[in-house]
Amino acid sequence: MAQLDTLDLVVLVALLVGSVAYFTKGTYWAVAKDPYASSGPAMNGAAKAGKTRDILEKMEETGKNCVIFYGSQTGTAEDYASRLAKEGSQRFGLKTMVADLEDYDYENLDKFPEDKVAFFVLATYGEGEPTDNAVEFYQFITGEDVAFESGASAEEKPLSALKYVTFGLGNNTYEHYNAMVRNLDAALQKLGAQRIGSAGEGDDGAGTMEEDFLAWKEPMWTALSEAMGLQEREAVYEPVFNVTEDESKSAEDETVYLGEPTKGHLEGQPKGPFSAHNPFIAPIVESRELFTVKDRNCLHMEISIAGSNLTYQTGDHIAVWPTNAGAEVDRFLQVFGLEEKRHSVINIKGIDVTAKVPIPTPTTYDAAVRYYMEVCAPVSRQFVSSLAAFAPDEATKTEIQRLGSDKDYFHEKITNQCFNIAQALQSITSKPFSAVPFSLLIEGLNKLQPRYYSISSSSLVQKDKISITAVVESVRLPGASHLVKGVTTNYLLALKQKQNGEPSPDPHGLTYAITGPRNKYDGIHVPVHVRHSNFKLPSDPSRPIIMVGPGTGVAPFRGFIQERAALAAKGEKVGTTVLFFGCRNRNEDFLYQDEFKAYEEQLGDSLKIITAFSRETSQKVYVQHRLREQAELVSDLLKQKATFYVCGDAANMAREVNLVLGQIIAQQRGLPAEKGEEMVKHMRSSGSYQEDVWS
């Protein structure tokens, strides 16, 4: 019998672990809820405000026959849930409510009435994990020991009365594409629940999320109408929120939100715990440019979390709460005829008791657009279509109706141009859309979301300071007639310019309210929170690691190397550390070149930095090419239990690296190609292959 090497043993252990996981359904471990996620109240959250966690009681109290649950990390699933609720109400007369999965308990789902329906709109986060607000529900419903109030076992089909609808939001560049909705659907089917229509899946990786959603929902509504005896009617706009102007208050009134994220911030007394619902206003203590070319920017920033009680671990993410650019705020207010009253105070209230107001209130039109609404995002065909009834003239109405009904035409005129809502409407007419209710804009646009960045420092080395590394987005995409500018990275560039002595920062022609609402961010501050990641160094520092991180994908690996250098300086044994780094040109965008050179001198042969420069010669060289060239080294380190890490572009680089690694394993061991692929999959399941990727 051939002798087993270490990687083979790792694979066997992974198979054993996988088998235990399968048969125990995770009894011995579970998806970890983000330790930094807040358990505090969200604005107008019914259950979180101390009210019932019994969803059936809530539906009975409020006269609802349709609940739409969402599991959302960035706000998209929540937006889709709200859109489904609105459409169900307006087109089919359903009494709908939107519900955050973490607001309720689920032991009484076996008593769900037959004449009601539950929707589940679930995003898959990271490596096939539930979003933070869906962790507890997911653990409950998929658990082997799931127990309902009736005491019925899974074999007795306790959810036979439950009618449900599912839609998943995923990304096909990730290994576990739409795992959440698939696993939930299987669990509900096993428990006897009746799915209405197909289990929908949207693919952000292919850029078809919106069209996948639109294509799925029409046959779903048909199936639901048949199952529940619904009659479609002409959809007429019915506001979810009541927006009123308050002439008794001015923008200077201390009770008016001018961009403050919470009541504590409004009152000038922000208190922790700081989280995704309550950011810390952190000082930026250092900011500098990493590129040496003038037409592109990459920022290094040091953000202090001293005194906040925020903590992080090497490999975690930091969330930056952005501000919309002044030019886009002005454009939006002009398009909707709000420029003259931008500083008027408005109150926003939910017409239905279950409606959650996404914006702090009272506020102003300007503050809502600048700090709270995602006005720069690509606009959806469905939302554009909803504005037809409020068009300034018949010709514009006809054009909007065509855009709404013809997906190819919409793709040509709007999607290809990467237009946001204001740009899209400006491309149709110069007349303002003054008749559009502001409530419709709040309903149709997402809340402005924090953007996440891989932390590029070690918590062991600087526990009170977080480093971030970010390329500033200002690119002309194929087909677009204008530069597409990143919301957060250009905001950060403006802060860097101001900190470094430029009196009037205007990155790529944009200006920002740098000092924040009521000058509360003066002195170069930015709102942040920390999010836990499973992207971690081995607990044993003597274990080898292989890191693949081109461009800003090197960010977490700077932290990894920083930490290993600190451990080595303390006399600890540090395993072989290999970094595959790629960029265009060593003299233009080789990030942290001098730092890495110093670490190489300190760590000697234990640190190997292997570079790939794509534009130095006529032949483009990428990290996957260097990986293949170093096949023997990679194979040897895997035999020594090396952990393999990838950070960066999911759509191309990460896929290529995954493929090349499988080929290396197969070739170096004389195995069939499919065996190499299988071994990489087992490395993933055992945690010895980790990704921090984006598309």
UniProtKB/Swiss-Prot annotation:
Residue numbers binding NADP(+): 296, 552, 614-615, 620-624, 656
Alphabetical list of SUPFAM superfamilies matching this protein: Ferredoxin reductase-like, C-terminal NADP-linked domain, Flavoproteins, Riboflavin synthase domain-like
Signal peptide from the UniProt entry: none
Top-level taxon: Eukaryota
Catalytic activity: 2 oxidized [cytochrome P450] + NADPH = 2 reduced [cytochrome P450] + NADP(+) + H(+)
Domain Flavodoxin-like: 66-221
Its EC number(s): 1.6.2.4
Positions bound to FAD: 451-454, 469-471, 486-489, 694
GO-annotated molecular function: flavin adenine dinucleotide binding; FMN binding; NADP binding; NADPH-hemoprotein reductase activity
Pfam families according to UniProt: FAD_binding_1, Flavodoxin_1, NAD_binding_1
Cytoplasmic domain ranges by topology: 32-695
Binding site for FMN: 72-77, 123-126, 169-178, 204
PANTHER family found in the cross-reference section: NADPH--CYTOCHROME P450 REDUCTASE, NITRIC OXIDE SYNTHASE-RELATED
Role this protein plays: This enzyme is required for electron transfer from NADP to cytochrome P450 in microsomes. It can also provide electron transfer to heme oxygenase and cytochrome B5. Involved in ergosterol biosynthesis.
Family of the protein in this entry: Belongs to the NADPH--cytochrome P450 reductase family.
UniProt-recorded name of the protein: NADPH--cytochrome P450 reductase
Organism: Aspergillus oryzae (strain ATCC 42149 / RIB 40)
